[in-house]
Amino acid sequence: MTHEEQRIWLIKELQKDRSQLSHYRIPNDEQGQKDLLRGLMNIWMPKPISEEYLRIESEYLRAENEAKGITKISDLTPVEKDLYLWQGDITTLSCDAVVNAANAQLLGCFRVLHSCIDNCLHSAAGLSLRYRCFEIMSEQGHEEPTGQAKITPGYNLPSQYVLHTVGPIVSGRLTEEHCELLKSCYLSFLKLAEENGCESIAFCCISTGVFGFPQHKAAEIAVSTVKEYKKQQAAISR
């Protein structure tokens, strides 16, 4: 199959899961097709996936991700020793692990074409990521608590792992509890990363979007927590 044929095949396979969308016309333009495929992935309910689908999806998504351009840690300039500040698409970073700011269900974002990091990572990684999260949550039997972390493979992402953490929601005045919970997010995924042999981690701004955590304070907590952890644990180098 050509890249376009793979995209159309994937769309048709996912349309089979939604009877009301099975006769939805596939757009003729490339961007329209990409948006439809991503939208179908966004609303996909987790269930076992065929090997054929996974193979074609993997070939397609890896080509898409490579076309965006992969950024390696070695391409970046540290602001301090082994500490980097980078603005860009985290789905294009090649490192041991990237951090996902997840919600308590831990299944990814179901809002079609939403721009949150949860949606972007799941869309670039493929359906296997949602299914693995579903297995983890089914075994756990309850929502993911704030301040903890889970780890999954990165699947079709350039990074080996995804670390999922649920940040605190600030709906009113910022409290000390909010700050401690955010710090716990960083400590939890740093510890989990170390346990899985990760040396380089890329993390987004946790809780600073719709969760309402003040950005400046969140950045202070992130940097200070990482620095403190690195002093005690040398395994996480970057």
Task: Identify what each model region corresponds to.
Residues 1-238:
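Macrodomain-like recognition of ADP-ribose-binding/processing modules
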